[in-house]
Amino acid sequence: LSIFVASRATTEDAFDQSELQENGRIAMRLLTQDLKWAGFWGDYTGSPMAVGQGVTLSAGSSVLAANDCLDNLGRGSLPPSVGTNRGIWVAGVDNSRAITGGAFACIPVASRIANTDVISIKRLIGLPLADAAATGNRFYLATTTQAAQMFKGGETVPAMTPERQLWEYQHFIYYLSPNAAGNPELRKRYLTANGGSVLISGPMAEGIERMTVLFGVDDSPVPDGEIDRYVATANVTEQEWSEGRVVAARIFILVRSLQASSSYVNNNVYQVGSTSVSGNGDGFRRLLLESSVSLRNPAVMAGGGA
């Protein structure tokens, strides 16, 4: 009997470890890939990503506030008329599940997990498109090095110049949410032209218990793109965001097994970025993962002004 119990415990441990690694790998790959491309606007590099400063919007390029995901400054998915378009912005969910500055009301309070981060990423997707492809339920950006024109799928494609490129424009939001069974999951919202910000059906990865980002900040009087310090999300100032001084991200995710084990007691303490998470003696196995990403596009495109 003792041999059987030991064998079962070993099998259970191996299964949990495999599950943790696979869920963690999927989550980290999704996050790092999108973070690498945050603030990517194709060949448009001449001016800030803001309406009236190189960017124009078509008549159909609008999203109702009720269908959008607004940040702490009230800016939504599309380029604003005041201030610049944040290619990346991260907000914290506090212990009462409130989000920094009242941001992202698109995420119901019941669908939030306390003491985690919400990651907002705006960027262009994939490779330049043929004009005939710009017909879907999406927003598109026609770009040159000096100008960018946004339009809705099905509208007339901006003529601009023969050298212009055509891209799909997206706004992704990653956050953690409990499922019906109470297990934590990584969820993702994306932008549509007809419905605004829409939640992708089903989790992107299961068992993601915590997600925290530390940011590398360039403090040089004249920004040189070098990291001078890492700070928690809450300690990045509005000026540092808008001036492109946030040049790197360190992503921490804590993955938890989907079921507790009767043969395991977790008394470990995990340092998830700036937050310590205790196993509290429960039966869930956990795995802490970390990865770093350079944020070159926001630094290049920073135009100043909040």
Please place each PLM-identified region on the residue numbering.
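N-terminal pilin/flagellin-like segments and related low-complexity appendage regions
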Residues: 27-248, 252, 258-285, 290, ...
